[in-house]
From Swiss-Prot:
Natural source organism: Homo sapiens
Glycosylation, residue list: N16, N50, N114
Transmembrane region(s): 203-226
Primary location: membrane
Name of this protein: Protein EVI2B
């Protein structure tokens, strides 16, 4: 229960107690002068035409105030039996023949009984108390304080109302019914204002509670996340195995370390460039430099055929440099791999077959052999010179064969054609079994 309501109830109860205490004091002061409204039966019978009857068939009750005195019957139209006349404990007033009023406020109104004297007497409509007074025993008059109720009983006119003051004053007791407490007027306004305040307070409390709980949940989540997160391992071998570690860290340990490492993607700036240098271009540059140096050492520049051979060899070496891996010179076993030339006994048959087939068979390199290298210019010149000398020596003396001498131009053309065919189709595969450290043979005297 709200404390405001409790305080308000206590305050109203205090006011109620003070109000009824004042009424009790007023009744004690006025007990010395009670007013009793009586009339004689003779006067009532004399004015029998003015007497009123109960139209609803309800009996009227009489109250005997003193011996030999009674009150005239009253007419009541409310449908309730009228009690006998009794003295009011608060402020009784009566209309007499002189025009003095008598007023008493009750809660329920009762209709007026019309008589000729216009004198009002007020009774209670709910209960039927009887006030009886005697000289020996004072009666207890039950007084119910109500508001907004009026009734009037008229007594015959032109008769003086006698007021008797008995020697023994009756004691009046006031009974406060539980329904007599006035209603609280402030309840209507207070009930309208308190629900709004309660709503605002509840909304504020809910918001504060939600904020506090959300903060606690967030703190707990952050703490758990930091505790459950795995610590970062400080790997000393993040860059791989050290080149200076001579077997100190075995490969098994390295494998375990690499498995535990988190795979990270690493990209270099070179991958973003549009052109990347390849090994083939580098090897081609090396071969061009070596060929240029070897060409400077050659003194035999008078022969145009040799220059033509150099140009052809340079073109073939540059074309084949893309598939090569190492630019080194050919081994010294090039001469041993060449088959000997066939004996040229029939010159006429040789002349007829020169244009169709070459005179010597050449071994072609394997396509899958990655170690096949082009021969250098020095080796080609040396081989060409050797074959030339062998071809010259293979011819028998002209005198022994008894053949006519061939013309000089024919001999030169034959030699030139043989050299061109041999040099163009000459490619020697290196011997993998031969030792590369074997010394090369000295160059021929013609090249020097």
């Amino acid at each position: 229960m709200d404390p405001k309501y409790f305080i308000l109830i206590l305050f109203c109860g205090h006011l109620n107690n003070t109000f009824f205490s004042k009424t009790e004091t007023i009744t004690t002061e006025k007990q010395s002068q009670p007013t009793l409204f009586t009339s004689s039966m003779s006067q009532v019978l004399a004015n029998s035409q003015n007497t009123t009857g109960n139209p609803l068939g309800q009996p009227t009750q009489f109250s005997d105030t003193f011996s030999g005195q009674s009150i005239s019957p009253a007419k009541v139209t409310a449908g309730q039996p009228t009690p006998a006349v009794y003295t009011s404990s608060e402020k009784p007033e009566a209309h007499t023949s002189a025009g003095q009023p008598l007023a008493y406020n009750t809660k329920q109104p009762t209709p007026i009984a019309n008589t000729s004297s216009q004198q009002a007497v007020f009774t209670s409509a709910r209960q039927l108390p009887s006030a009886r007074t005697s000289t020996t025993q004072p009666p207890k008059s039950f007084v119910y304080t109500f508001t907004q109720q009026s009734s009037s009983v008229q007594i015959p006119s032109r008769k003086q109302i006698t007021v008797h003051n008995p020697s023994t004053q009756p004691t009046s007791t006031v009974k406060n019914s539980p329904r007599s407490t006035p209603g609280f007027i402030l309840d209507t306004t207070s009930n309208k204002q308190t629900p709004q305040k309660n709503n605002y307070n509840s909304i504020a409390a809910i918001l504060i509670g939600v904020l506090l709980t959300s903060m606690l949940v967030a703190i707990i989540i952050i703490v758990l996340w930091k505790c459950l997160r795995k610590p970062v391992l400080n790997d000393q071998n993040w860059a791989g195995r050290s080149p200076f570690a001579d077997g100190e860290t075995p490969d098994i340990c390295m494998d375990n370390i690499r498995e535990n490492e988190i795979s990270t993607k690493r990209t270099s700036i070179i991958s973003l460039t549009p052109w990347k240098p390849s090994k083939s271009t580098l090897l081609a540059d090396d071969l061009e430099i070596k060929l240029f140096e070897s060409s400077e050492n050659i003194e035999d520049s008078n022969n145009p055929k040799t220059e033509k051979i150099k140009d052809q060899v340079n073109g073939t070496s540059e074309d084949s440099a893309d598939g090569s891996t190492v630019g080194t010179a050919v081994s010294s076993s090039d001469d041993a791999d060449l088959p000997p030339p066939p004996p040229l006994l029939d010159l006429e048959g040789q002349e007829s077959n020169q244009s169709d087939k070459p005179t010597m068979t050449i071994v072609s390199p394997l396509p899958n052999d990655s170690t096949s290298l082009p021969p250098s210019l020095d080796c080609l010149n040396q081989d060409c010179g050797d074959h030339k000398s062998e071809i010259i020596q293979s011819f028998p003396p002209l005198d022994s064969l008894n053949l006519p001498l061939p013309p000089v131009d024919f001999m030169k053309n034959q030699e030139d054609s043989n050299l061109e065919i041999q040099c163009q189709e000459f490619s020697i595969p290196p011997n993998s079994d031969q030792d590369l450290n074997e010394s090369l043979p000295p160059p021929p005297a013609e090249l020097l």
